[in-house]
From Swiss-Prot:
It comes from Vesicomyosocius okutanii subsp. Calyptogena okutanii (strain HA). It comes from the Bacteria. Pathway: Porphyrin-containing compound metabolism; protoporphyrin-IX biosynthesis; coproporphyrinogen-III from 5-aminolevulinate: step 2/4. InterPro entries: HemC, Porphobilin_deaminase_cofac_BS, Porphobilin_deaminase_N, Porphobilinogen_deaminase_C, Porphobilinogen_deaminase_C_sf. This is Porphobilinogen deaminase. The keyword Transferase applies. GO terms for molecular function: hydroxymethylbilane synthase activity. Binds 1 dipyrromethane group covalently. The keyword Transferase applies. GO terms for biological process: protoporphyrinogen IX biosynthetic process. One of its GO terms (cellular component) is cytoplasm. The modification S-(dipyrrolylmethanemethyl)cysteine is found at residue 241. The gene is hemC.
């Protein structure tokens, strides 16, 4: 195959790692393929003084990448799946989901070993509504302070003494070589992960069969089933980053367990449900779990 493939990517260290990972995988499969990274600065990267929920959500991290594909400047875009909104413009589709890295959240601190180890009124940095909600349940005494920026920026703020601890995704830390900074992998029962956390997705033009065939070898089937279930739940709930929604699927012997969570930071109300079934029913299970949460009052919580 003699072809050039252009990958649209954000310019953060983690985004570049992910794009480079896809580039390396493809070049190994297709020795005659030339892969070029098209580095793009998105609005989400530029606006760092406001929380994502106030400036338009996680779609701000991918819109410019989609425009690059539409204009023919790029062929595909590589994303962290947790940054991909539940609604994708009809001109695009997810062509591949790669094998997931550790999907859990990480407790990172220079002085304390876990959330439980933090002193009263300790300062904890995070900008995630989902993390804030769950932190307030297990440690209502903590001072939770908004923290934006890439992984390196957040770690520097911790090292400069602005926080006693910060919460990040394990996957990003591991991929960037900061796995040793993880003091605690926060257990699922304390902090349910974000929908799609730890997975890399490739977005392409809708019905682009040539590109679809090209990236097909990168698809991880088990991760795909998990993400399909999680995203189906999120889509049915119409959950964005402005509301605390968590979704986490596991697979064992082709049986999927999906846990979903919806909450309200102000009232402290949390709804949490599980559903089980065969992986072939991943999307249906996600919708059914969302409907169970809706029956419990999830829509009212999300409206608030």
């Amino acid at each position: 195959m003699n072809k050039t493939l252009k990958i649209a990517t954000r310019q953060s260290p983690l985004a570049l790692w992910q794009a480079q990972h896809v580039k390396s995988r493809l070049e190994k499969i297709y020795p005659n393929l030339t892969v070029i990274l098209v580095k793009i600065t998105t609005k989400g990267d530029q606006i760092l003084n406001s929380s994502l929920s106030k400036i338009g959500g996680k779609g701000l991290f991918i819109k410019e990448l989609e425009i690059s594909i539409m204009k023919g400047m790029s062929d595909i875009a590589v994303h962290s799946m947790k940054d991909v909104p539940y609604e994708i413009p009809q001109e695009f589709e997810l062509g591949a989901i790669l094998k997931c890295e550790n999907p859990f959240d990480a407790f990172v601190s220079n002085h304390f070993s876990s959330i439980d180890d933090l002193p009263k009124n300790a300062k904890v940095g995070t900008c995630s509504m989902r993390r804030i909600l769950q932190l307030k349940v297990i440690r209502p005494d903590l001072q939770i302070i908004d923290l934006r920026g890439n992984v390196n920026t957040r770690l520097k703020k911790l090292d400069d003494g602005e926080f006693d601890a910060i919460i990040l995704a394990c996957a990003g830390l591991i991929r960037l070589g900061f796995g040793n900074r993880i003091k605690q992998q926060i257990p699922e029962n304390q902090n349910l992960p974000a929908v799609g956390q730890g997975a890399i997705g490739i977005e392409i033009r809708e019905n682009d069969k040539e590109i679809l065939d090209l990236i097909k070898p990168l698809i991880d089937i088990e991760t795909s089933y998990r993400i399909i279930a999680e995203r189906a739940m999120n889509t049915q709930l119409e959950g964005g980053c402005s509301v605390p929604v968590a979704g986490f699927a596991t697979i064992n012997n082709k049986q999927i367990t999906l846990t979903g969570l919806v909450g309200n930071i102000d009232t402290g109300v949390i709804l949490k449900e599980k559903i089980f079934g065969h992986v072939s029913q991943a999307e249906i299970l996600g919708i059914e779990l969302a409907n169970k949460l809706i029956l419990l009052g999830a829509k009212d919580i999300l409206k608030d």
